[in-house]
């Protein structure tokens, strides 16, 4: 919920409202039969979108609304995504929706069996295990020595951020969307200046991003159901949560039974 009167709200940046209250964080969530919301915050979901996919539009909208404009503005022909989790997968989908020719996903050995195959189904050109291969060497090989037009860090790891800066081409853009959970991390400021790199920090969604994401989900470029690992009725919420604790998953859906 946003106040509609503060400076960010007046600029259309309702996600940065100084009085913002989020459902599931500051207000009760929606793992229940009924939830009370202001009508002005509701979006109509087209019939073409299955309920299970409608459930993941909100987190996807943050990635889609922030990444696609950068890709179009920079006319990126290749994008490297560091991190094969939910944010990374959403970034992959967003990049492919913007007609990026080459999208490369970097992850770790734990991603090889499940997440990398999902990434390939979603259109990833290549997947790289950064624990067994040199990410900088591999990216330079795949880009003929030019480096990446856009790097999106979805890992929040210090090593991932540093590698992202290293593989970026001169004048390229680093999009930061991974939380480091640290007060600060060191970066080579002079190296950033010499590369004339652009660094964009993005967080949160707004009503416009949601609408744009809904329009995309109604006519996606591929089957997005591969993003859903498991579904369960609300009455079996505990078993689903237990499953998530013991298995590698992406998005999981509870439905009203």
Language model features with spans:
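Structural detector of well-ordered beta-strand residues that form the stable sheet scaffold
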Residues: 80, 104, 173-175, 200, ...
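Mid-domain Rossmann-like dinucleotide-binding core that forms the NAD(H)/NADP(H) cofactor-binding site
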Residues: 49-132
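Glycine-rich cofactor phosphate-binding loops and adjacent beta1-alpha1 units
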Residues: 70-75, 113, 117, 121-198
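C-terminal hydrophobic helical "lid"/dimerization subdomain
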Residues: 90, 133-134, 162-166, 170, ...
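NAD(P)H dinucleotide-binding glycine-rich loop of Rossmann-like/cofactor-binding domains
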Residues: 1-82, 111
């Amino acid at each position: 919920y946003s106040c509609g009167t503060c400076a960010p709200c007046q600029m259309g940046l309702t996600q940065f409202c100084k009085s913002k209250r989020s459902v599931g964080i500051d207000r009760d969530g929606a793992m229940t039969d009924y939830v009370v919301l202001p009508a002005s915050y509701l979006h109509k979901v087209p019939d073409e979108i299955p309920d299970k996919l409608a459930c993941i539009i909100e987190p996807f909208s943050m990635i889609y609304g922030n990444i696609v404009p950068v890709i179009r503005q920079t006319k990126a022909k290749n994008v490297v995504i560091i991190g094969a989790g939910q944010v990374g997968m959403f970034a992959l989908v967003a990049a492919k929706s913007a007609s990026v020719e080459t999208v490369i996903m970097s992850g770790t050995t734990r991603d090889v069996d499940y997440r990398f195959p999902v990434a390939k189904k979603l259109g990833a050109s290549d997947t790289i295990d950064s624990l067994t291969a040199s990410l900088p060497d591999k990216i330079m090989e795949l880009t003929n020595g030019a480096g990446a037009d856009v790097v999106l860090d979805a890992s929040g790891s210090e090593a991932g951020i540093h590698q992202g800066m290293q593989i970026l081409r001169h004048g390229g853009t680093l999009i930061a969307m991974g939380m480091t959970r640290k007060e600060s991390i060191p970066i080579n400021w002079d190296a950033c200046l010499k590369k004339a790199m652009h660094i964009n920090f993005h967080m949160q969604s707004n009503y416009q991003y949601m609408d744009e994401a809904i329009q995309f989900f109604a006519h996606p470029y591929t089957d997005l159901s591969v993003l859903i690992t498991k579904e369960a009725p609300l009455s079996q919420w505990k078993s689903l949560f237990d499953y998530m604790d013991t298995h590698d998953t992406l998005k999981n859906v509870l439905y009203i039974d």
